[in-house]
């Protein structure tokens, strides 16, 4: 997977099928976009591209909080596993945020991304003050030689799946609901830290994981889990909170 991180001057030589999103928490709705774009890319012989931002737009305007359901590292891994050929992590700053919708279409969608097909959600907005929408995107498709595909929002129990909803469930510790809404098990990927080896004294293996600081964690408590080490899966009990071992 080719990655363009934090740059505005780049060019993709291949014609692409591209989908857009903040992808602040990759859930069933996001996977519907990626899967639709991937299917079109395979059928048409184009490359699959994902466009997102190097930092979530909310972090640009607000103080830092641990609110990411899916960290940047986790997102990259999931995109690669989904067969994405090009990942664009576009810089979000005053200059790029003030880009008019038609300028964004001309410079980025048609220019940088070399898009043949554009796959977006029905509520997608882009450009200065979020003034661009699906109607604007479709109005320009003939001029810039791309085709628009609109994917409806995924729902669970008649409610639209959103990152906001998933954050609420994580903060409540409703991890079964979280896994349903994500479409895969909630995960924590982190570095191993040296502990006090108390688990060894009690006759079972333990490992202390330090998660990424932007990762949104469930409440302190003990959770049934699986641990993957060097590709091997183990059933485990995970303690979220002050390390006991």
Please describe what each predicted stretch is.
Residues 27, 79, 118, 178, ...:
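Residue-level signal for inorganic ion chemistry
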Residues 98-205:
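Classical nucleotidyltransferase
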Residues 74-88:
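A glycine-rich helix N-cap at a beta->alpha junction
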Residues 9-71:
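N-terminal catalytic cores of NTP/NDP-binding nucleotidyl/phosphoryl-transfer enzymes
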Residues 2-8, 88:
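Short acidic-hydrophobic, aromatic-tinged amphipathic segments that line or gate anion-handling sites
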Residues 195-245:
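Phosphate/ribose-recognition catalytic cores of enzymes acting on nucleotide-derived substrates
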Residues 57-62, 95, 160-161:
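A short acidic, helix-capping loop that chelates divalent metal ions and anchors anionic groups
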């Amino acid at each position: 997977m080719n990655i363009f991180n934090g740059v505005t001057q780049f060019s993709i030589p291949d014609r692409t099928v591209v989908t857009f999103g903040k992808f602040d928490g990759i859930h069933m709705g996001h996977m519907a976009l990626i899967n639709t774009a991937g299917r079109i890319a395979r059928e048409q012989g184009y490359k699959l591209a994902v466009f997102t931002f190097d930092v979530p737009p909310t972090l640009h305007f607000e103080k830092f909080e641990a609110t990411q359901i899916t960290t940047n590292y986790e997102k990259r891994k999931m995109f690669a596993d989904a067969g994405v050929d090009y990942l664009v992590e576009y810089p979000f700053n005053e200059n790029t945020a003030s880009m008019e919708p038609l300028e964004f279409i001309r410079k980025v969608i048609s220019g940088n991304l070399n898009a043949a097909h554009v796959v977006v959600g029905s509520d997608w907005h882009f450009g200065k003050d979020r003034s661009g929408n699906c109607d604007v995107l479709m109005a320009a498709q003939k001029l810039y030689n791309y085709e628009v595909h609109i994917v409806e929002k995924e729902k669970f129990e008649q409610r639209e799946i959103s990152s906001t909803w998933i954050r609420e469930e994580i903060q409540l510790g409703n991890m079964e609901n979280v896994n349903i809404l994500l479409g895969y098990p909630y995960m924590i990927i982190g570095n191993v830290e040296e502990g006090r080896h108390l688990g060894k004294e009690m006759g079972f293996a333990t490992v202390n994981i330090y998660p990424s600081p932007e990762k949104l964690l469930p409440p302190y408590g003990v959770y049934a889990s699986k641990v993957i080490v060097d590709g091997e899966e183990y059933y485990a009990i995970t303690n979220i909170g002050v390390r006991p071992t």
